[in-house]
Amino acid sequence: MGLRKKNARNPPVLSHEFMVQNHADMVSCVGMFFVLGLMFEGTSEMSIAFLTLQHGVVVPAEGLPSGSRTLYHYGVKDLATVFFYMLVAIIIHATIQEYVLDKLSRRLQLTKGKQNKLNEAGQLSVFYIVSGIWGMIILASENCLSDPTLLWKSQPHNMMTFQMKFFYISQLAYWFHSFPELYFQKVRKQDIPGQLIYIGLHLFHIGGAYLLYLNHLGLLLLMLHYAVELLSSVCSLLYFGDERYQKGLSLWPIVFISGRLVTLIVSVVTVGLHLAGTNRNGNALSGNVNVLAAKIAVLSSSCSIQVYITWTLTTVWLQRWLEDANLHVCGRKRRSRARKGTENGVENPNRIDSPPKKKEKAP
């Protein structure tokens, strides 16, 4: 399945340019290999480990017609599932890049640096919208909105539903796919350290909530975080788009800081006051994480990612505002010089920098 338009002049096989242009096709072939494995008895079990959720347990459930339901815990086989859906994320990334963002970049006629920023903001906007809608559906279906106590407890405490586990698997797969995308998108070397920290903080936060079974709390914090990040990405798209909409970006700092404060307040109140509950003697082997170490880990992950992202985005927007201010000042100086050079459409002979008139020689 071709996702990239091939150039008239094909680069050498396995060269850097060849890998960048055809990485979606190659990843599609790898993913198809796991799908075709379902057709054969000898490889179907291995393929199932990559394509479906593992470590399921059937538990009794009152009120259901079957009298039971399947809950999940995490295990080593989850790495295979994360790997497969990481391949899916790479394919979706390439599809959005070619059929949406590349066309938008050509229409706006942006420079190479602005194209990279536009591509990043566009990809993240799609991811945040899909994750936000998906996460809100899960919170509503598991009664987290009507029963806030589920944010720090769940029964049983070492299990999760299918949709909850699949959400976390997909989140981990997306952020892991960001590592090879640094190569495929030709990210500048000076930007790679910041990108690695940004991706690592997300993986630390999501992985911590997944491994500590703080599923509902982690999901709510992600929804708050993604809402603010979506606003930042939309502001970036407007910044590179029509100038008529750039005046509305003045509301961005207020909403951004407010969203970060709400996220920190929810983290501190929920984790600091209610996570431990009445039983403070947790058993990590059984999945009970009501211990001080778990609280410190959750609070540190939440605070660290909020502080880092706030500092990074604030710095970026300050640089943009300074650039716009400098351009505005330079433009105003040019206009003032042009006005001084002419008065009512006639050149002013008294200007200091005007060339002296040549004297006419007598015949």
Swiss-Prot record:
Comp. bias (Basic and acidic residues): 354-363
Protein keywords: Endoplasmic reticulum, Membrane, Protein transport, Translocation, Transmembrane, Transmembrane helix, Transport
Gene Ontology CC, one term: endoplasmic reticulum membrane
Chain ranges passing through the membrane: 30-50, 81-101, 121-141, 160-179, 192-214, 219-241, 251-271, 296-316
Cytoplasmic membrane side: 1-29, 102-120, 180-191, 242-250, 317-363
UniProt keyword Acetylation, yes or no: no
Keyword Transmembrane helix set for record: yes
Membrane topology, from the record: Multi-pass membrane protein
Cross-referenced SMART domains: TLC
Top-level taxon of the source organism: Eukaryota
InterPro entries: TLC-dom, Translocation_assoc_membrane
Ranges where the TLC domain occurs: 116-324
Localization annotation: Endoplasmic reticulum membrane
Biological process terms in GO annotation: SRP-dependent cotranslational protein targeting to membrane, translocation
Annotated region described as Disordered, given as residue ranges: 338-363
Stretches of the chain found on the membrane's Lumenal side: 51-80, 142-159, 215-218, 272-295
PROSITE patterns (UniProt xref): TLC
Function: Stimulatory or required for the translocation of secretory proteins across the ER membrane.
Family: Belongs to the TRAM family.
Name of this protein: Translocating chain-associated membrane protein 1-like 1
Protein species of origin: Mus musculus (Mouse)
Phylogenetic placement of the source organism: Eukaryota, Metazoa, Chordata, Craniata, Vertebrata
